């Protein structure tokens, strides 16, 4: 399949790299130092599941150089959503699917308003990953999960084709029939973790290991969970308790927001 990583940050680079290693034609939208490193040295992934070096990758700052693709992995930060969606237009063909792998609960609607609902698939990504430098992606968690599906639960042949391709590339991809529930579950988890990370300056393993911060973290999730229930989102009643025991709470897991907070404090 022809696939574009919009853009070549940690999430786009990881999934794009795994798909390219499996033989798919992947384009990486990048800029500045990251772009130059990708062009010169290729993409390097350092992962607990095995390192990967792709010495030759197609990286460009201009989606017009890519043209229509089968799948766009849309993984920019939320504040860049509208700008990135506009830039994505040259990569949209009649059967293109754009999978939104962003945090939050409204990226699907925002991207759909620009590219059209027929092209956009809501998704979530569970992965602890950062750029370790230009052209270098660091994956530090045992998990690297992609979840996606039509918001109304309907089948999509192009998405099904991508799911099979991702599975063949050893990507843990999990199709969902209720993506509204899935994106809210991710939001409840991540917004709470980001808040407690930034307040305490502690990774989640340390938060869970101290009774007061553990209780505070749980309370944050319960408040977000209550909002989801008021909105009619079908999150399971015991979801917060299950999340507190989840293996996704690896000892050094922290939100990207916490990394930003730390960098600002160091300046």
Locate predicted features.
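Single conserved hydrophobic/aromatic residue that forms the stacking wall/gate
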Residues: 248-267
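Rossmann-like NAD(P)(H) cofactor-binding subdomain of soluble oxidoreductases
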Residues: 52-137
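Short, well-ordered alpha-helices that flank and scaffold nucleotide-derived cofactor binding pockets
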Residues: 17, 21, 86-90, 113, ...
């Amino acid at each position: 399949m022809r696939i574009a990583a919009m853009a070549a940050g940690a999430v786009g680079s990881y999934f794009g790299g795994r798909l390219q290693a499996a033989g798919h034609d992947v384009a990486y939208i990048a800029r500045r130092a990251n772009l130059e490193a990708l062009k010169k040295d290729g993409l390097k992934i350092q992962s607990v599941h095995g390192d990967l070096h792709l010495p030759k990758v197609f990286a460009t700052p201009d989606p017009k150089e890519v043209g229509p693709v089968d799948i766009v992995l849309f993984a920019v930060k939320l504040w860049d959503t509208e700008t990135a969606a506009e830039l994505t237009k040259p990569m949209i063909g009649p059967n293109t699917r754009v999978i939104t792998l962003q945090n939050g609960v409204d990226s699907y609607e925002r991207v759909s308003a620009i590219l059209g609902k027929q092209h956009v698939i809501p998704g979530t990504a569970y992965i602890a990953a950062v750029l370790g430098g230009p052209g270098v992606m660091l994956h530090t968690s045992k998990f690297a999960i992609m979840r996606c599906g039509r918001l109304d639960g309907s089948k999509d042949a192009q998405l099904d084709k991508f799911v099979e391709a991702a599975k063949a590339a050893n990507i843990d991809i999990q199709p969902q029939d209720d993506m509204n529930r899935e994106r809210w579950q991710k939001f409840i988890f991540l917004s709470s973790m980001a808040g407690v990370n930034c307040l305490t300056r502690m990774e989640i393993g340390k938060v869970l290991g101290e009774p007061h911060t553990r209780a505070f973290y749980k309370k944050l999730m319960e408040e977000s969970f209550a909002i989801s229930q008021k909105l009619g989102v079908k999150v399971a009643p015991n979801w917060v308790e299950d999340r507190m025991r989840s293996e996704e709470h690896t000892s050094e897991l922290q939100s990207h927001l916490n990394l930003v907070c730390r960098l600002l404090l160091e300046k």
